[in-house]
Amino acid sequence: MLSVIILAAGKGTRMHSSLPKTLHTICGEPMLFYILETAFSISDDVHLILHHQQERIKEAVLKRFKGVIFHTQIVEKYSGTGGAIMQEDKTPIPTKHERVLILNADMPLITKDALTPLLESKNNAIGLLHLADPKGYGRVVLENHQVKKIVEEKDANDEEKEIKSVNAGVYGFERKFLERYLPKLHDQNAQKEYYLTDLIALGINENETIDAIFLEEEYFLGVNSQTERAKAEEIMLERLRKNAMDLGVVMQLPDSIYLEKGVSFKGECVLEQGVRLIGNCLIENACIKAYSVIEESQIVNSSVGPFAHARPKSVICNSHVGNFVETKNAKLQGAKAGHLSYLGDCEIGKNTNVGAGVITCNYDGKKKHQTIIGENVFIGSDSQLVAPINIGSNVLIGSGTTITKDIPSGSLSLSRAPQTNIENGYFKFFKKP
């Protein structure tokens, strides 16, 4: 086994946001959560180094993960990546295991499989990337698959600038290596920071073996700006779409479909173009038609859309919800709402038909109220159901009716002003003076 240390103390200034960088989301999940999941998949000893807005980050983590060991970086005294793993006396933070893997919290695309080459190394090791264009990165000079030195671009000569090997920002160390060299680390550089790369340089000077482990670039993209966050999200979306299609989900124009990590599919499902699936959703044997939005809801044996919006806590089973219908905290069981309706805080029974323009008036300005609709109910177009209201089964509601009282089963309900036709009214109205 090994211990994992995740570095998450930075300010994330380039994100230009009051939200801590590591809590910015990738497909609905804070990017820090991805790296924590990966860490717990390989270790029972996970450490998180914090400083900037640490209480906010800690609160978010504790809602989701158990067993994370939190540390506060002493940035006033020991800043930088090397300082992140130092205690007050410059010794490494205590870990359960002798092997220590160090990761950055802003790399949400890392997976267990992507780390395998680094995990298999028995020596102290640094993860490397081979970049076609390494401009802006420090170069890693190799000799017989071992790290000879790490040189910053501004200090590199012309030959070194041609090197394509750069630091991926992930490391595997033996604890005794950290104990030996961390106290020797210094901050005599332009940034006045302690760097893990300098730690490696100290080891090389003492003829320590440092393995160079090449990793796949896609998995080790660091997120330091909104542009990089968007790039990482697109890569994650590609993974989620592929996983869904591998399960048999039919996607029309996959690149136009957005889905989040909490979405699950069962049975035969179709997603038309422009669909957005947000939060923890279950889509089972269902067709989600073009440009519909499903949030924190369950769609089972049903068709939804096009241009429909199922807001949180909607459960739509054996039903049809058509274009421009919005549901919220609604339970539909075998019902139809073809178009242009708002169905909020309601339960609708089987074989019930909701006409165009029907609205459940669920909010009285202070509280939300529920509408209960039974089975075999026909609700005429442009009707308003003023909650709280209970409509029995086998009920017919005439078009344009405003319901303010419960309706017993078997009833016909009407409430409308009598129609008046005025003979020659048109001509009288438009008569010229």
UniProtKB/Swiss-Prot annotation:
Gene Ontology biological process terms, A to Z: cell morphogenesis; cell wall organization; lipid A biosynthetic process; peptidoglycan biosynthetic process; regulation of cell shape; UDP-N-acetylglucosamine biosynthetic process
The protein's UniProt keywords, in alphabetical order, are: Acyltransferase, Cell shape, Cell wall biogenesis/degradation, Cytoplasm, Magnesium, Metal-binding, Multifunctional enzyme, Nucleotidyltransferase, Peptidoglycan synthesis, Repeat, Transferase
Positions annotated to bind UDP-N-acetyl-alpha-D-glucosamine: 7-10, 21, 80-81, 138, 152, 167, 224, 311, 328, 342, 353
Which residues are noted in the entry as Mg(2+)-binding? 106, 224
Q: Which molecular function GO terms apply here?
A: glucosamine-1-phosphate N-acetyltransferase activity; magnesium ion binding; UDP-N-acetylglucosamine diphosphorylase activity
**Annotated SUPFAM superfamilies:** Nucleotide-diphospho-sugar transferases (SSF53448), Trimeric LpxA-like enzymes (SSF51161)
Q: Which residues does UniProt call coiled coil?
A: none
Name the catalysed reactions: alpha-D-glucosamine 1-phosphate + acetyl-CoA = N-acetyl-alpha-D-glucosamine 1-phosphate + CoA + H(+); N-acetyl-alpha-D-glucosamine 1-phosphate + UTP + H(+) = UDP-N-acetyl-alpha-D-glucosamine + diphosphate
Q: How is the cofactor bound?
A: Binds 1 Mg(2+) ion per subunit.
Task: State the GO CC annotations.
Answer: cytoplasm; membrane
Identify the cofactor(s): Mg(2+)
Specify whether Cell wall biogenesis/degradation is a keyword of the entry: yes
EC annotation? 2.7.7.23, 2.3.1.157
Described purpose of this protein according to its UniProt entry: Catalyzes the last two sequential reactions in the de novo biosynthetic pathway for UDP-N-acetylglucosamine (UDP-GlcNAc). The C-terminal domain catalyzes the transfer of acetyl group from acetyl coenzyme A to glucosamine-1-phosphate (GlcN-1-P) to produce N-acetylglucosamine-1-phosphate (GlcNAc-1-P), which is converted into UDP-GlcNAc by the transfer of uridine 5-monophosphate (from uridine 5-triphosphate), a reaction catalyzed by the N-terminal domain.
Whom does it interact with, and what assembly results? Homotrimer.
Indicate the family of this protein: In the N-terminal section; belongs to the N-acetylglucosamine-1-phosphate uridyltransferase family.
Q: What is this protein called?
A: Bifunctional protein GlmU
The protein's organism comes out as Helicobacter pylori (strain P12)
